[in-house]
Regions:
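Helix-loop-helix "hinge/cap" segment bordering the ligand-binding cleft or interdomain interface
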Residues: 138, 165-236, 251-299, 306, ...
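Conserved N-terminal structural module of periplasmic/extracytoplasmic solute-binding proteins
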Residues: 2, 10-20, 25-190, 194-204, ...
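Conserved small-residue motifs centered on glycine
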Residues: 380, 384-505, 514
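Short, solvent-exposed loop/beta-turn-alpha elements that line the ligand-binding surface or hinge
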Residues: 48-54, 136-155, 199, 246-268, ...
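General small-molecule cofactor/ligand-binding pocket signal
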Residues: 91-95, 289, 341-343
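Carboxylate/His-rich catalytic cores and anion/metal-binding grooves
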Residues: 125, 132-148, 211-214, 225-241, ...
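Long, K/E/R/D-enriched contiguous segments that form extended
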Residues: 307-309, 315, 323-339
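Periplasmic-binding protein-like
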Residues: 338-364
Length: 551
C-alpha cells in the first residue's frame, strides 16, 4: 500500500492546504541577512553536481510525517548514511499521517515548527506567508546551484515564477520532475477491456461503452471504482470536461479562456462532469461504496479485494496501486491469467487533455533559520539532498554497491538479499530497504526525480503509461497566478471555506442521485448567496494586479 499512500497524502494534503487561507499579522522572515556571518559549516565553492559535506558538523531539525505501516526508527541506515556523507545530523519531530495537515499548521502557527518542513505541495505555503513564519526562500536560491541547474535544464522557470506571492517572492521550493504525468489515473483489467469492453478507452464516452459491455458479461459487478472518497477520480476526470475537482479543486478558481478566472464548480464543464458520473451511478456502472468509504490514505471501499474478485475492473490508482491489484489477482485469478494496465486519463469534451505539468512535494523553511549560524550550510545541504542526482538515487535505492548495483548503461538492480515491498521488487530478499533501512521513504524519496530515476523502480507498464501520456495527452495550461495580499487572504478564507463545503456536499449528492440535477441552478444560487461573486471578484482583482506588476 505504501506506493499508493505516498501519492495519497501529498494530494490530499495539497487539496486541504489550498483553502487554508487564514492570515496572521506578525512580521518576520524579511529582514536583512549577513550570510558571511551565518556560514558556519558551509562549503566554499559549492557547485552543482558536487557532494555537500559540512565543514563543521551541525544538527538540523526536521518535521517527519509517519505513515501507520512505516514507523520511523532511529536505527535506519538512512539517518546514519546521511550524517556520514554530509556531517549533518537530522533531529526529527514526528507527526502522524492521520492528522498531518492539522498538526503541521498548529506547529507553524505556534512558532514551534522545526527548521525544515518537508512534504509541502505548491499552494500550501499561502496560509503562512503573511505571518512571517516562513523564509522567503526565493531570496536565497542563488546559493542553491543544483536547484538552479535543473530548473533550467528541465525548463521549469515559468512554473517557478508562478510560485510568487503578492510580494513577488516565493516561500517554498518544490520537488522538480523531469517529466510530469498524472500520478493517479485509471488502473484497468486490460485483458477484460480488450476481450469484453471493446478495447482500451481513450475518452470517457468510450469508457462508458466499455463499462456497459463488462457489466453485461459480469452482472454482479459494478465495474468502475474510486476508493478515495471520489476525490481521486474527479481530480483526473475533471480536466477532460474543462473543470477542476476533487484533489485538484485547489481554490476553485480556473482560467475561463480569456485570462480571467471563474469558479469551476459553477461552470458548465463541472455540471457536465457531474451529469456524466450521475449516469454511471444510475446504471450501476460505478461502485458507490468506493465514492463514500472513509479514506485512510490507502483507498477505501475494499477496492483491491473487489478487483481481485472481478467485481471491479477499473479503479483509481497510481503505479503502486497497479502492483497492489496484480498481487491481489495472483491469489484469485492466478498469475498469468490477467493483465493490469495504468492508462492515460480519458479525454472528453475539452479534448485529450490532462492536468497541467506539475511539481511534486518540496519543503518550506522556518523563518527563524535566518538567525542560525548554519544558515548557508543548511541551504547547501537542502540543495544537495533535494536536487543532487546522486543524493536522489541514494534516497531511493540506498548505498551503491551495498544495497544495489548500477551497470554502464545506468540500469539499477537491487541486490538479491534486499527487497522493496512497496514496488514488489525482489520479494524474497531478507531486508526491505524501505521498512528496515529507511530508503525510499515517503518524506524525501519521491520529491525530485529525473525520468530515469522514476523508471528505475517502476514496472515496464508504468514506462508505457508515461510514454502514452506524453504522446497522446496535452497538459492543460496552468491557471494564471493571482497571489493575495494579507487582507485579501483573510477575506478569501471567510468566503472560500463555506463555498468549498457546499461544493463538496452537493457534488457527491448530485452524483449519488440524492439531489436532482434539475436543481443545478438552485445549487449555483446557494453559492451566490454565500458570496461567490465577491470571491471571484477578489481573486480576479489580485490576478490583474499581479499581471500589471509583473508584465
Amino acid at each position: 500500500m505504501r506506493a499508493t499512500r505516498r501519492g495519497v497524502i501529498g494530494i490530499s494534503i495539497a487539496a486541504s492546504g489550498a483553502l487554508a487561507l487564514a492570515a496572521c499579522s506578525d512580521d518576520g522572515g524579511g529582514g536583512e541577512v549577513d550570510l558571511e556571518k551565518q556560514s558556519k559549516g558551509a562549503m566554499d565553492g559549492f557547485a552543482a553536481d558536487s557532494q555537500f559535506t559540512a565543514t563543521e558538523a551541525f544538527t538540523l531539525s526536521l518535521l517527519w510525517t509517519e505513515w501507520p505501516d512505516l514507523p520511523i526508527t532511529d536505527s535506519w541506515q538512512f539517518f546514519t548514511e546521511i550524517e556520514k556523507r554530509t556531517n549533518v545530523k537530522l533531529e526529527v519531530t514526528t507527526i502522524p499521517f492521520s492528522d498531518a495537515v492539522e498538526k503541521r499548521s498548529l506547529l507553524i502557527s505556534a512558532g514551534d515548527a522545526p527548521t525544515v518542513i518537508p512534504l509541502v505541495y505548491t499552494g500550501e505555503e499561502d496560509s503562512f506567508v503573511s505571518s512571517g513564519a516562513l523564509l522567503p526562500i526565493s531570496d536565497y536560491v542563488e546559493h542553491m546551484p543544483h536547484f538552479q541547474k535543473y530548473v533550467e535544464e528541465w525548463d521549469l522557470g515559468e512554473m517557478i515564477d508562478n510560485l510568487k506571492q503578492a510580494d513577488g517572492k516565493y516561500y517554498m521550493l518544490p520537488g522538480l520532475q523531469e517529466v510530469s504525468v498524472p500520478v493517479f489515473t485509471l488502473v484497468i483489467r486490460k485483458d477484460v477491456f480488450e476481450t469484453v469492453g471493446g478495447g482500451i478507452p481513450e475518452t470517457w464516452d468510450e469508457m462508458r461503452e466499455a463499462l456497459v459491455k463488462i457489466k453485461a458479461e459480469y452482472p454482479d459487478s459494478k465495474p468502475l471504482a474510486d476508493g478515495f472518497e471520489a476525490a481521486s477520480m474527479l481530480n483526473y476526470a475533471a480536466h477532460a470536461f474543462g473543470a477542476q475537482a476533487g484533489w485538484g479543486f485547489g481554490d476553485g478558481m480556473m482560467d475561463d479562456g480569456s485570462g480571467k478566472l471563474e469558479y469551476t464548480a459553477a461552470s458548465a464543464g463541472y455540471k457536465q462532469m457531474v451529469e456524466y458520473f450521475r449516469g454511471l451511478v444510475e446504471d450501476g456502472l460505478i461502485d458507490t461504496d468506493s465514492l463514500t468509504a472513509a479514506n485512510d490514505g490507502s483507498g477505501g471501499g475494499s477496492v483491491s479485494e473487489k478487483f481481485a474478485n472481478e467485481l471491479v475492473f477499473a479503479a483509481s490508482g497510481s503505479s503502486g496501486t497497479a502492483i497492489e491489484f496484480a498481487q491481489a489477482l495472483n491469489e484469485t485469478v492466478g498469475e498469468g491469467n490477467y493483465e493490469v494496465l495504468q492508462i492515460a486519463p480519458p479525454g472528453g469534451p475539452a479534448g485529450q487533455v490532462c492536468e497541467p505539468r506539475n511539481f511534486w512535494n518540496g519543503f518550506m523553511l522556518n523563518a527563524e533559520i535566518t538567525e542560525s549560524e548554519n544558515f548557508l550550510a543548511t541551504l547547501q545541504f537542502l540543495d544537495w539532498i533535494y536536487y543532487n542526482p546522486e543524493a536522489r538515487e541514494l534516497l531511493r535505492w540506498g548505498v551503491l554497491d551495498e544495497t544495489y548495483t548500477k551497470d554502464a548503461s545506468g540500469k539499477i538492480t537491487l541486490k538479491p538479499e534486499f527487497r522493496l515491498d512497496a514496488y514488489n521488487i525482489n520479494p524474497d530478499g531478507a531486508t526491505d530497504i524501505q521498512k528496515d533501512l529507511g530508503w525510499s521513504n515517503s518524506v524525501f524519496a519521491d520529491s525530485t526525480e529525473s525520468r530515469a530515476l522514476k523508471e528505475s523502480y517502476n514496472t515496464p507498464t508504468f514506462v508505457e503509461y508515461v510514454d502514452s501520456v506524453l504522446a497522446t495527452r496535452t497538459p492543460r495550461e496552468p491557471n494564471p497566478p493571482a497571489p493575495l495580499d494579507e487582507m485579501e487572504l483573510e477575506r478569501a478564507s471567510l468566503l472560500a471555506t463555506p463555498l468549498k463545503d457546499t461544493v463538496d456536499t452537493n457534488t457527491l449528492r448530485f452524483i449519488m442521485g440524492e439531489r436532482d440535477i434539475a436543481e443545478w441552478d438552485d445549487y449555483v444560487a446557494e453559492l451566490e448567496a454565500q458570496g461567490l461573486q465577491q470571491y471571484v471578484d477578489l481573486v480576479n482583482t489580485a490576478r490583474e494586479r499581479f499581471e500589471e506588476e509583473n508584465s
